[in-house]
């Protein structure tokens, strides 16, 4: 059992515990994978307007664990860290436990924003829409209304946004507990609260996201991490058919998570 993750130093020790464990079943998938580079030379430049996010963006790197830094798990309470360890062992045995995406349900938040697939952003009066290639997930960010007084929990929750200067601040609540924080299986409850801060940097060629996650049920403390999405006007999000879940079947024939 891992100790509770209460400080940055403790979180680093947890990461070392997972990455350097004598238990081969706890070996982690490599923490970072490069996804998108800059757009090819000659591509259409991004808008000079810092509030114009319209277009296709592609995450620059992908991480299995969405902790406060690369390869560091979220600050989970001990009982939920035990669940994460169990899921990692099952995956490494070749018998991964099911999650929402196993049967083509949405990935949920904040996990969806880590997907290594491109996103098309569309801006209209009162709303910003994220069209995700992965499983054709759609996020609607409302700019002209607050959260409803009562929310039925859903996979992607309810998102409202506002501009603070050149930064789009998105507040998401009303998430159900049927998904995970990240691809390794870090648990969250229906009390999870996600705040995203988006701003264009590097001459508008990069979209910076600072994500802050809180959950009083499963986490010992709030935590934040940063991601960069590349401006990719040369990319057109493709068809994604989740139901064809055997198209990448491994050689050992294991295609079903239990």
Which ranges hold each PLM region?
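Bacterial N-terminal signal peptides
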Residues: 1-5
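PEST-like low-complexity, intrinsically disordered acidic/proline/serine-rich tracts
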Residues: 8-258
């Amino acid at each position: 059992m891992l100790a509770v993750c209460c400080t940055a130093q403790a979180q680093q020790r947890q990461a070392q515990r997972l990455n350097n464990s004598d238990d081969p079943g706890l070996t982690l998938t490599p923490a970072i994978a490069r996804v998108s580079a800059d757009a090819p030379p000659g591509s259409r430049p991004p808008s000079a307007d810092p509030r114009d996010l319209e277009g296709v963006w592609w995450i620059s790197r992908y991480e299995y664990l969405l902790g406060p830094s690369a390869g560091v798990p979220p600050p989970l309470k001990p009982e939920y860290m035990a669940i994460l360890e169990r899921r990692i062992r099952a995956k490494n045995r070749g018998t991964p436990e099911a999650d929402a995406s196993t049967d083509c349900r949405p990935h949920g938040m904040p996990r969806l924003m880590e997907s290594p697939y491109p996103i098309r952003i569309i801006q209209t009066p009162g709303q910003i829409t994220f069209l995700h290639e992965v499983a054709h997930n759609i996020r609607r960010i409302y700019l002209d209304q607050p959260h409803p007084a009562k929310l039925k929990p859903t996979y992607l929750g309810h998102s409202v946004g506002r501009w603070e200067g050149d930064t789009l601040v998105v507040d998401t609540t009303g998430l159900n507990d049927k998904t995970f924080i990240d691809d390794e299986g870090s648990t969250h409850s229906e009390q999870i609260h996600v705040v995203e801060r988006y701003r264009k940097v590097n001459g508008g060629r990069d979209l910076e996201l600072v994500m802050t996650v809180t959950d009083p049920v499963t986490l010992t403390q709030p935590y934040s991490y940063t991601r960069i999405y590349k401006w990719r006007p040369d990319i057109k999000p493709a068809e994604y058919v989740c139901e064809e879940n055997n198209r990448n079947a491994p050689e050992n024939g294991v295609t079903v998570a239990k």
